[in-house]
Amino acid sequence: RSGERDYLLKLLREEKTDVLIDQTEGGVTGRWGIFRTRTQMEEAPVKLVAVQHSSQYSALRYYHLVHKRRGAASFSGKCRDFLFNALALPVKRLRARWLQKSLFRELAANYDRIVTLSRGGMEEFRLLAPGTPAEKLAAIPNPVPPIEAPPLPQEKEQRVLFVGRLDNSVKGVDRLLRIWARAGKSLPDWHLDIVGDGPDAAALKELAERLRLSNVSFEGFRNPAPYYRRASIFCMTSTFEGFGLVLPEAMQHGCVPMAFNSYAAVRDLVIPGETGILAPPFDEEEYARQLLRLMQDDPLRSAMAQAGPQHAALFSPANVVREWNSLLQH
């Protein structure tokens, strides 16, 4: 990679760069970086800032849920899946954990600042890289572009919304259908809109048929804004996310969010009981119970919907730029 090193050093010197922000999680310096060590960058001394976009702690914690093989039709295929899940998957998880801890230790050693997307992300980084100085870590969320005006209360309908990629391994849309089978059948006037496309679209439509869900529509890939405006409740059922931009997007539109309490940033995005609801990780029965309560309790839902836009404003581009400016100047 000498060509890459020479090019980057030349560019940094010519541009008189003060700060280099690495959005690749260790792609500039470290074991998998352009530079193996920080000393190789001495010709172009810059402040190095690494940005963590995902929740690696949650990715490791729920590794088995994301990578588990399922759905084989034949007996031999089911046997292969069983052997992989029982024998290979635990080994792969241990290797992934070792690699991630090695990467985080190198980030802590080679970078001046490490930016996570949430306060909880800072804590998780230190769990994987113990001894990381607290002053090296900062939490700056992703920005949420503002909307012109939130919908009026009379625009809201009895609709629950999902927006995202139809990928069960991470997004858990199959969980949502099972949850809806518990909650939605009790209130047939309510409707679930699923906006998005992905590799599991056909399987999800088959699951909806098996569960005999009549008040569900698969909308495909669409502009979600009109759906946010008319929906009253937003459901995210992901195994984990890096941030979860759809949650503050929903709050901007007075659409009350629900999610599993399964990753760090969600606890910054949703204040339980005030701006939305967090269910215990992957407890579908409790999620359905809370969803049913939210659909039935108009005053509770209205109070959360009114609190949402103000909380979502914390993630405005202006606030995020202000935090970045503060970090870069110190």
For the regions a language model picked out, list residue spans one by one.
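Conserved donor-binding/catalytic core segment of Leloir-type glycosyltransferases
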Residues: 148, 152-171, 177-180
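Aromatic "clamp/platform" in nucleotide-sugar-dependent glycosyltransferases that forms part
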Residues: 239
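Short hydrophobic beta-strand element within catalytic cores of glycosyltransferases
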Residues: 256-260
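Nucleotide-activated donor-binding/catalytic signature segment of Leloir-type glycosyltransferases, i.e.
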Residues: 202-221
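Conserved acidic donor-binding segment of nucleotide-sugar-dependent glycosyltransferases
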Residues: 261, 271-273, 277-284, 293-299, ...
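A short, active-site helix/loop in glycosyltransferases that binds the activated sugar's phosphate group
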Residues: 89-136
